A protein has these predicted regions:
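N-terminal small/polar loop signature for handling phosphorylated ligands or for N-terminal nucleophile
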Residues: 1-44, 53, 156-167
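Short glycine/serine/threonine-rich phosphate/pyrophosphate-binding segments
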Residues: 3-6, 28-34, 71-74, 188, ...
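Acidic-glycine-rich active-site phosphate/pyrophosphate-binding loop
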Residues: 7-10, 92-99, 120, 186-193
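A glycine/threonine-rich phosphate-anchoring loop and its flanking beta-alpha core
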Residues: 41-137
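Active-site segments that bind and position negatively charged phosphate/pyrophosphate groups
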Residues: 128, 132-217
């Protein structure tokens, strides 16, 4: 989500004295709402919050997920871009108070978005699972379970995106891939994501597509 758009949302929210946010969408929408939640209680420019990297003073936020991918519905992270300078940085706020995950909301997604979401989820897990081998057998087995689920369901989703159970597995995999669970006691390397962010900032490529390009094969 771009800071230019989010500044407008923050200004409108302050004018209307907004005290609760409901983000309905995918990772970009939820990420943007996290910065809005912080910006509503900040007197300066919201980009300053992004460059600081974090803010724990926010208005409450809930989410309704429509595109599984980023795990933003169950973590406190966000990624915010700035079109003017072609920059893209991580930002950390508060966790959503609740998130609603209804697989039926994914039935009409374009297949390209689904593919990008699957790639994003897969790389999230890989950047935790593959960094240092053998740190935690329990976390390794959990990570492998998510990876195996993605490998199994991806071709099935391509053939039948209206299967409730398939899309439920996809949604849960995306959430579990980046909610901190499989990261417990595990070193992480996010180089693939950092390079992917640069490709998005400089060339406007979809995040999941950049990860599919960059992840070592």
């Amino acid at each position: 989500q771009s800071i230019e758009t989010l500044r407008e949302a923050i200004a409108l929210g302050k004018e209307r004295e907004v005290d609760f946010l409901l983000a309905v969408g995918g990772g970009s929408v939820i990420d943007g709402a996290k910065l809005i939640a912080a910006g509503l209680l900040y007197d300066g420019d919201a980009w300053e919050l992004v460059r600081k990297g974090a803010s724990q003073r926010t208005v409450p936020l809930g989410t309704v997920l429509t595109i599984p991918a980023t795990g933003s519905e169950m973590n406190n992270g966000a990624v915010i871009s700035r079109r003017e300078t072609k920059e893209k940085y991580p930002f950390y706020g508060n966790y959503p108070l609740f998130s609603i995950l209804d697989p039926e909301k994914t039935f009409t997604l374009p297949q390209r978005q689904v593919a990008c979401g699957l790639a994003d989820t897969f790389v999230h897990v890989m950047e935790q699972y593959m960094t240092v081998a053998g740190q935690s057998r329990v976390m390794d087995r959990w990570a492998e379970g998510i990876l195996q689920t993605l490998v199994e369901i991806a071709p099935e989703i391509r053939e039948n995106q209206h299967d409730y159970d398939l899309m439920a597995d996809f949604m849960l995999s995306a959430t579990m891939g980046l909610n901190g669970f499989i990261a417990m006691g595990v070193a992480q390397d996010w180089a693939t994501h950092m390079i992917g962010h640069e490709l998005t900032a400089l060339h406007g490529l979809t995040h999941g597509a950049t990860l599919a390009i960059v992840l070592p094969g």
